[in-house]
Amino acid sequence: MSNSISSLISVPFQYNYDDGFGDGGGQQSYINIQPVIPFSIGANWNLISRTILPVVNKGDFFPGDDSRTGLGNITQSFFFSPKDPTKNGLIWGVGPALQFPTATNDIAPNQWGAGITGVVLKQTNGWTVGMLANHVWSIGNEDTYGESSKTFLQPFVGYTTKRATSFGINTEAQYDWVAEEWSVPINLTVGQIIKVGGKPVQLTGGVRYWADSPPGGPQDWGARLAVTYLFPKG
């Protein structure tokens, strides 16, 4: 699923694993539950809701750091998107991005956040090329956790065959404006749509390479597995 604002309900469960944190022995695995739900608003526009709820396990970032599991902060994005592509075939959407302080067990700073998000892409002859981006500022608990100002950039290229096999490459780069640090994983994935109980499901697997990360951040290679349940509208 290369088009994150298609008029299709999708519910991905995306597992990720990275290591090399802290002194080199730290690990983190997490499942992103990220439903995408479109709503029609009149004859010409859609409102796309995209939620990301991380369930995280992490540990061994430093000596005596026990493994712990908890929730991360929820990121909620809304895209206002025209139902029809532009004359040049571009599909686009823009809207607000919100962060809810749902983190538990010291998984992440428990802060409210707000900002803006947007996506633009073009699909032709099986290819999808585009960019998703957002910027979120902290708006709460800054006395406890400090200020936060982060930009997320996700350029992506994908190809889907006539047999519904997909190949993709993207980065999920994040720039921390306060710390002045980049995190840049490069992801390579392969997916296949199958039928389970007569319903379409996409299975995806892949690897990532950390081209850049802050001190104490993930290093070298990571892995990704995903199951996406698809619910065509109508």
Model-assigned labels for residue ranges:
Residues M1-G234:
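Transmembrane beta-barrel domains of Gram-negative outer membranes and organellar outer membranes
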